[in-house]
Structure formats: structure tokens, C-alpha cells
């Protein structure tokens, strides 16, 4: 299909640490290598990104920074972002329910308000839905 979907899930290093992911420099290095190899092979392939809003430790400001990063560093504007859902037996679920970093015991910001979780997502996708779910007048 000419595309590869990867799951950086976020771009802010602090949030990535809570997700157990490498920092944003790894993502940029991978993207650059992918583009270089495509160009050398004469291919027109591209990356799509799986991103998550409202993960434990993620704030509205982190989502604003994600939007800036994807625009400037990745040169793309995400159309899909998933809102974090805690899954059983995961470290992220422990963080969500305890509101603590299980490795340090420190209090962790966790957005649990449904509207504010949606707001984190909307920072990225607002204006892209063109009225889906709403009546245009």
C-alpha cells in the first residue's frame, strides 16, 4: 500500500518515559532513515503514526507540543488520535488508577474528566472532522 504505520504514541519525552517508549530523537532518526531509504530505492512510501491522548502523565500542554512537533519535525498533521484506555495488567493502567508513578512513588497527573480527555484529543484533530456528528447550518 506504500505506507507503514508506526506507534510512537506521543512526542514529548516526559510522556514517552511514562509509556516506556524511546525519546522523540529516535522517532526523528527513524523517519529520516525511512525517507532516505525510500529516496534511494525510488519509492514513494510514507509513514502514518498511531498517537494517544490523555495517557497518564500527559497534559493539555503536552498535546499542544505534540501538535507543534508533528507539524514541524514530522511535517504532517494527524487525522487520528486515540484517547488512552487503561488495559488490565499494564503499567499504564496502574498509573491511571493509582495516579502514581509505580517506579518512583511520585504523584502523577492523570486526566480522568471525560470532556478534558476529549479536549486533549481535539487539540490534534479539531477542524479535521468537518462536522462529523454535528449538523451543519
Model-identified regions with their sequence ranges:
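Conserved AdoMet/S-adenosylmethionine-binding subsite of the radical SAM
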Residues: 1-77, 83
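C-terminal accessory regions of radical SAM enzymes
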Residues: 61, 77-137
